[in-house]
Amino acid sequence: MINTTSRRKIEHLKLCAESPVEARGVSAGFEDVTLIHRALPELNMDELDLTVDFLGKRMQAPFLIASITGGHPDTLPVNAALAAAAEELGVGIGVGSQRAAIDDPAQEDSFRVVRDKAPNAFVYGNVGAAQIRQYGVEGVEKLIEMIDADALAIHLNFLQEAIQPEGDRDATGCLDMIAEICSMVRIPVIAKETGAGISREDALLLHKAGVSAIDVGGVGGTSWAGVEVYRAKESKDPVSERLGELFWDFGIPTVASLIESRVSLPLIATGGVRTGLDIAKSIALGASAASAALPFVGPSLEGKESVVKVLSCMLDEFRAAMFLCGCANIQALHNSPVVVTGWTLKYLEQRGFNVKDYSLPKNAL
């Protein structure tokens, strides 16, 4: 029998595949970022080095297929397709929240398939901050072992929890538990927002807690408040529907959050990353990697080859962006100048950030 958590997972997957769930009135901010074109790149585009070492694992490009799904029998072929594509192209991949497998061990195979299909890829596990207090270190270790994870993402999705009628709205003690997990588990811990962004204040707290990386998960991509609007309409829950509508675009856009979160930790740019140019802009702004989920949902329902096609296109775009910026490798892109304008510039100035440094060559990232 399918439990509530498992049923919710397949509902989320179907909604993301079939309904408009992206931010509506706010963008990730990539249009406010200009890379400096080099008319004389003096490089062979086919010889660029896109490889990167991320949290102890070599990847063929600084990109991860972000957490999408798992925890329902119908999600197994989806995760199989995503993982096989990640393995073929040498990028990383995260699993969806493993909570469903804790609630029902029969669902473990929908997560294990990721490691089975991607034996050499960087794979990260996934559990909610609201749940780690309940599971403790022992429970978290089981999640890690389930997929032989290279890292563990602890997702911070309190916006979604606030809107879900079944949401866990008690956020007390989460930071202390994150610190305990970081000190006890054998693999890196990633603090992962899921669409509302990370502020400077929280980045500093997470750094102090001992996380190894931050996934900024900013506004501009999938709105989980928006996803809950559709669920609320289906269940005829006007209170949750109103909350979701109100907070559909709530949070910090991805580009702004990237700069907010620069606290001497590796950063993952997630939220509205849709092209290889977005990946390049993210790396130039200081991210160690970029990731996306929604662009792969539809293709994953079709199979591995469809995922490979979409991902290959993004990586080709990324290679072209590096070439046109005169960057032979990822470190060169880290050090390349960018110009930040528009709404993002105004936001960052009001928050006290000096973005002029980004326009200087060899800026220290």
UniProtKB/Swiss-Prot annotation:
MF terms (GO), sorted A to Z: FMN binding; isopentenyl-diphosphate delta-isomerase activity; magnesium ion binding; NADPH binding; oxidoreductase activity
Keywords for the protein's UniProt record, in alphabetical order: Cytoplasm, Flavoprotein, FMN, Isomerase, Isoprene biosynthesis, Magnesium, Metal-binding, NADP
GO cellular component: cytoplasm
Gene Ontology biological-process annotations: isoprenoid biosynthetic process
Pfam families listed in its UniProt record: FMN_dh
SMART domains: IMPDH
Subcellular location: Cytoplasm
Record-listed E.C. numbers: 5.3.3.2
NADP is among the record's keywords: yes
Catalytic class of the enzyme: isomerase
Cofactors (names): FMN; NADPH; Mg(2+)
Residues given in the record as Mg(2+) binding sites: E161
Reaction equations catalysed: isopentenyl diphosphate = dimethylallyl diphosphate
UniProt key word Ribonucleoprotein: no
Binding, FMN: S67, I68, T69, S97, N126, K192, T222, G272, V273, R274, A293, L294
Residues where substrate binds: R8, K9, S97, Q98, R99, Q160
InterPro entries registered for this protein in UniProt: Aldolase_TIM, FMN-dep_DH, IPdP_isomerase
NCBIfam families: IPP_isom_2
Subunit structure: Homooctamer. Dimer of tetramers.
HAMAP family assigned to the protein according to its UniProt record, in alphabetical order: Idi_2
Protein family per UniProt: Belongs to the IPP isomerase type 2 family.
Function comment: Involved in the biosynthesis of isoprenoids. Catalyzes the 1,3-allylic rearrangement of the homoallylic substrate isopentenyl (IPP) to its allylic isomer, dimethylallyl diphosphate (DMAPP).
PANTHER family, sorted: ISOPENTENYL-DIPHOSPHATE DELTA-ISOMERASE
Record protein name field: Isopentenyl-diphosphate delta-isomerase
Native source organism of the sequence: Methanosarcina acetivorans (strain ATCC 35395 / DSM 2834 / JCM 12185 / C2A)
Gene name of the record: fni
